[in-house]
């Protein structure tokens, strides 16, 4: 089902954030509908992939847990995969840690390889890919490696002030949860994620969710998107 990626350790030496000449406000977000006709019919012979996008603190991880419970998806968090590799104490993980501390994006093929391995190890065929892709480079690497586009893309739209407050309050002991790094992460998100959001909006795959409110209030906006799917 999946194509193996080759060794990617050499990519770290050239890792740096890409700068776009146009800011986030330049990109028009095309509103999409959440009718049943827009949800592709999943096939157990191939993966049904949903990308879950949103800035740090937008609540996408929390909503993924609700989607998993209601619709039987497997949650694949790009951030959790990277942190798990860091916790392993491997040399690979040490370089990932340095990259995150500098507020940079981990090389695309590194994250794609970790995601691919996680999907290959699952018996499920429905996946929520949380926090990826974070850039056009990420998007292209995933689609070229996996050989397919996502079926659905969720974007949790949340004001920056609210995201900062949430990240500071959650106190998870993460290496990337200090105020300076949060600001770097938000800046990188604004510069790199909007082209991805715009791309999938124009492809008719994007569902933009207002991520302000209680967990249950936000999930009620998500639920209709996946209503045609059963566990």
From Swiss-Prot:
Compartments, as annotated in UniProt: Cytoplasm; Nucleus
Which stretches of sequence are listed as region LID? 169-177
Q: Does the keyword Repeat apply?
A: no
| Highest taxon of the lineage | Eukaryota
Q: What note does UniProt attach to the cofactor annotation? A: Binds 1 Mg(2+) ion per monomer.
GO BP annotations, alphabetical order? 'de novo' pyrimidine nucleobase biosynthetic process; pyrimidine nucleotide biosynthetic process
The record's Gene Ontology cellular component field reads: cytoplasm; nucleus
Q: Which UniProt keywords apply?
A: ATP-binding, Cytoplasm, Kinase, Nucleotide-binding, Nucleus, Pyrimidine biosynthesis, Transferase
What is this enzyme's catalytic activity, as reactions? CMP + ATP = CDP + ADP; dCMP + ATP = dCDP + ADP; UMP + ATP = UDP + ADP
Q: What cofactors does this protein use?
A: Mg(2+)
Q: Which residues form a coiled coil?
A: none
Gene3D superfamilies, from UniProt? P-loop containing nucleotide triphosphate hydrolases (3.40.50.300)
Q: Where does ATP bind?
A: 57-62, 170, 213
Q: Give GO terms: molecular function aspect only.
A: ATP binding; CMP kinase activity; dCMP kinase activity; UMP kinase activity
Signal peptide start and end residues: none
Family statement = Belongs to the adenylate kinase family. UMP-CMP kinase subfamily.
Q: Give the protein's biological function.
A: Catalyzes the phosphorylation of pyrimidine nucleoside monophosphates at the expense of ATP. Plays an important role in de novo pyrimidine nucleotide biosynthesis. Has preference for UMP and CMP as phosphate acceptors.
For this entry, the protein name equals: UMP-CMP kinase
Source organism (scientific name): Prunus armeniaca (Apricot)
């Amino acid at each position: 089902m999946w194509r193996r990626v080759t060794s990617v350790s050499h990519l770290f030496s050239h890792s740096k954030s890409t700068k776009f000449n146009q800011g986030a406000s330049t990109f028009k977000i095309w509103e999409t509908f959440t009718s049943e006709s827009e949800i592709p019919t999943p096939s157990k012979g191939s993966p049904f992939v949903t990308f879950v996008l949103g800035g740090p603190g937008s609540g996408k991880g929390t909503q993924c847990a609700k989607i998993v419970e209601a619709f039987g998806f497997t949650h694949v968090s790009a951030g959790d995969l990277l942190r798990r590799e860091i916790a392993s104490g491997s040399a690979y993980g040490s370089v990932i840690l340095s990259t995150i501390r500098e507020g940079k994006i981990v090389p695309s093929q590194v994250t794609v390889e970790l995601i691919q391995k996680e999907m290959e190890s699952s018996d499920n065929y429905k996946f929520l890919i949380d926090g990826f892709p974070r850039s056009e480079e990420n998007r292209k690497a995933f689609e070229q490696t996996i050989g397919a586009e996502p079926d659905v893309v969720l974007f949790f739209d949340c004001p920056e002030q609210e995201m900062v407050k949430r990240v500071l309050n959650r106190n998870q002991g993460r290496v990337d949860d200090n105020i300076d790094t949060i600001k770097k992460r938000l800046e990188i998100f604004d510069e790199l994620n909007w082209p991805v959001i715009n791309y999938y909006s124009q492809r008719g795959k994007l569902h933009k969710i207002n991520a302000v409110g209680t967990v249950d209030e936000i999930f009620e906006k998500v639920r209709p998107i996946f209503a045609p799917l059963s566990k």
